[in-house]
Amino acid sequence: MAGGGRIPLWIVATVAGTGVLVVVGLFFYGAYAGLGSSL
């Protein structure tokens, strides 16, 4: 499996993890902001 992919796996994992954290963070922030504004 060495030399097959051009993008290192750790870079893919880091980008994917960061994207998931950003999406989850935006979701919770939007829910929190929505609840705060509705109150």
Swiss-Prot record:
A cellular-component GO term for this protein: plasma membrane-derived thylakoid membrane
Origin: domain of life: Bacteria
Keywords: Membrane, Photosynthesis, Photosystem II, Reaction center, Thylakoid, Transmembrane, Transmembrane helix
Localization annotation: Cellular thylakoid membrane
Entry's transmembrane regions: 7-27
Topology in membrane: Single-pass membrane protein
Primary residence: membrane
Family per record: Belongs to the PsbJ family.
PANTHER family: PHOTOSYSTEM II REACTION CENTER PROTEIN J (PTHR34812:SF3)
Subunit structure: PSII is composed of 1 copy each of membrane proteins PsbA, PsbB, PsbC, PsbD, PsbE, PsbF, PsbH, PsbI, PsbJ, PsbK, PsbL, PsbM, PsbT, PsbX, PsbY, PsbZ, Psb30/Ycf12, peripheral proteins PsbO, CyanoQ (PsbQ), PsbU, PsbV and a large number of cofactors. It forms dimeric complexes.
NCBIfam families xref list: PRK02565.1 (NF002722)
Protein name as catalogued: Photosystem II reaction center protein J
Organism (species): Synechococcus elongatus (strain ATCC 33912 / PCC 7942 / FACHB-805)
